[in-house]
């Protein structure tokens, strides 16, 4: 019998646009934990560093709740990047006009999975 145990981590209102983080998330979805961290460490993007922190948090949650679990048994099951809170600012322009500047944030949800056989 095969039992799935899933462990999650969330990063809320992280200071990067979801449009910039989603292509990075596509690279690690379905990969092993060790390979995902290696891919994220080699990327120079700000979103990769944010995603790396959330993936490490999910893996540490898994290892905390299951003491006989090691890093090579963990896989990245789900990565979701959603819109977060938007901060709107007024940007002064020429001739007394003003534009709106929108700073976008994102929510990152990571779910890691481990599979093990149970005899019985």
From Swiss-Prot:
Please name the Gene3D superfamilies in this protein's record.
Ribosomal protein L22/L17
Tell me the keywords, alphabetical order.
Answer: Ribonucleoprotein, Ribosomal protein, RNA-binding, rRNA-binding
Q: CDD domains under this entry? A: Ribosomal_L22
**Keyword RNA-binding listed:** yes
PROSITE patterns reported in the protein's UniProt record:
RIBOSOMAL_L22
Q: Which GO terms describe its molecular function?
A: rRNA binding; structural constituent of ribosome
Tell me the GO BP annotations in alphabetical order. Answer: translation
Q: Which InterPro entries match?
A: Ribosomal_uL22 (IPR001063), Ribosomal_uL22_bac/chlpt-type (IPR005727), Ribosomal_uL22_bac/org-type (IPR047867), Ribosomal_uL22_CS (IPR018260), Ribosomal_uL22_sf (IPR036394)
**Can you tell which superkingdom this protein's organism belongs to?**
Bacteria
Region called Disordered, residue ranges: 1-22
GO cellular component, as recorded:
cytosolic large ribosomal subunit
**Keyword hit for rRNA-binding:** yes
**Pfam families in the record, alphabetically?**
Ribosomal_L22
Q: What does this protein's UniProt record list under function? A: This protein binds specifically to 23S rRNA; its binding is stimulated by other ribosomal proteins, e.g. L4, L17, and L20. It is important during the early stages of 50S assembly. It makes multiple contacts with different domains of the 23S rRNA in the assembled 50S subunit and ribosome.
What is the similarity comment for this entry? Answer: Belongs to the universal ribosomal protein uL22 family.
* Assembly and binders: Part of the 50S ribosomal subunit.
Protein name (database record): Large ribosomal subunit protein uL22
**Species name for this entry?**
Borreliella burgdorferi (strain ATCC 35210 / DSM 4680 / CIP 102532 / B31) (Borrelia burgdorferi)
The gene name on file is rplV
């Amino acid at each position: 019998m095969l039992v799935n145990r899933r462990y999650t981590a969330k990063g809320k209102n992280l200071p990067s646009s979801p449009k910039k983080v989603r292509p990075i998330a596509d690279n690690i979805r379905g990969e092993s934990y060790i390979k995902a961290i290696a891919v994220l460490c080699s990327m120079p993007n700000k979103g990769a560093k944010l995603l790396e922190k959330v993936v490490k948090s999910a893996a540490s949650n898994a290892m905390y709740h299951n003491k006989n679990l090691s890093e090579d048994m963990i896989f990245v099951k789900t990565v979701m990047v959603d819109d977060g809170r938007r901060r709107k600012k007024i940007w002064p322009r020429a001739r007394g006009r003003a534009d709106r500047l929108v700073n976008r944030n994102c929510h990152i949800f990571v779910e890691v999975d481990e599979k093990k056989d149970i005899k019985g």
